[in-house]
Amino acid sequence: MMNRRAFLGAAGCGVAGVAALAGYAHLLEPFWLDVTRRRLPIRRLPQSLHGRTLLHVSDLHIGPLVDESYLDRVWRTGRELQPDLVAYTGDWVTWRGTAQLRQLETHLANAPRGRIATYATLGNHDYGERWRELQVAANVADRVTQSGIRMLRNESVDLDGMLVAGIDDLWSRHAQPRKALAAWRAGTPALVLNHNPDCLDDRAAWGGYDGYVLSGHTHGGQCRSPFLAPPILPVLNKRYTSGEIDVGDGRRVYISRGVGFNLQVRVNVRPEITLFTLHPA
């Protein structure tokens, strides 16, 4: 039988353990940036893009919740990678008011750019607090564009023979995959930027597109046990957690765990930026 002293000792250890885990989850892991390195397969990739690097950054959530010095460190890390291309897949800000536009302008001055090109899309938080404020989205998009980054809102551009398309945000009800991919033809090398991976499940709207997609939005669930799926995911399709997923119709998606947060807690889901090396599929 456990005596009082042993019981109190065990209880004290338990409390200390819980406090340590809480401190780790709140103060350490949300800012413990991971640089993930992967290969990105593109069918019929133009020769000029073989071996080029692409930095994927998502879910910055610039605003009152994410520490400014942490974001500065993210920018510095991204610039040191010297990517050829950079893709930002939305949720630039956590909107609370016009102060976020000034913060965004400051951070855009330091955000990494690709030596060849830099592209971006919008996420739901870029549409304001209720994801329906069109003027907020226009202001965010304008600031990004004025900084020299090519904003893609249901449109595409040609990159040396490869189509790069960007789909607008799903929750704001402005996602139009068919419009974004209007210039795509079967067999054309392409890459799609799309904030919310749930958008992938409207297959008919994608017009037969069978290439690679970069997404964010989920933050990887932010908390998960080593062997179980995250208990909370902001998507309908719970397959869409993080990392590379085979959609099943030729499309593959990489879902970033994101940089920022709306709730300062992460467990077993470190924030990330991802450095891809392009190669032929």
List where the protein language model places each region.
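C-terminal segment of N-terminal export signals and the immediately downstream linker at the start
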Residues: 1, 18-55, 68-69, 73-76
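N-terminal secretory signal peptides and thylakoid transit peptides that target proteins
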Residues: 1-18
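Extended active-site neighborhood of metal-dependent phosphoesterases/phosphodiesterases
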Residues: 36-39, 103-184
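Beta-strand-turn-beta hairpins that frame and shape the catalytic cleft
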Residues: 42-54, 149, 156-165, 185-186, ...
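Active-site-proximal beta-strand elements of phosphoester/diester hydrolases
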Residues: 51-61, 161-170, 191-195, 252-258
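Membrane-embedded segments
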Residues: 52-139
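Active-site neighborhood of phospho(di)ester-bond hydrolases with catalytic His/Asp-centered motifs
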Residues: 57-58, 86-90, 118-124, 152-153, ...
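Conserved beta-sheet core of the metallophosphoesterase superfamily
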Residues: 197-274
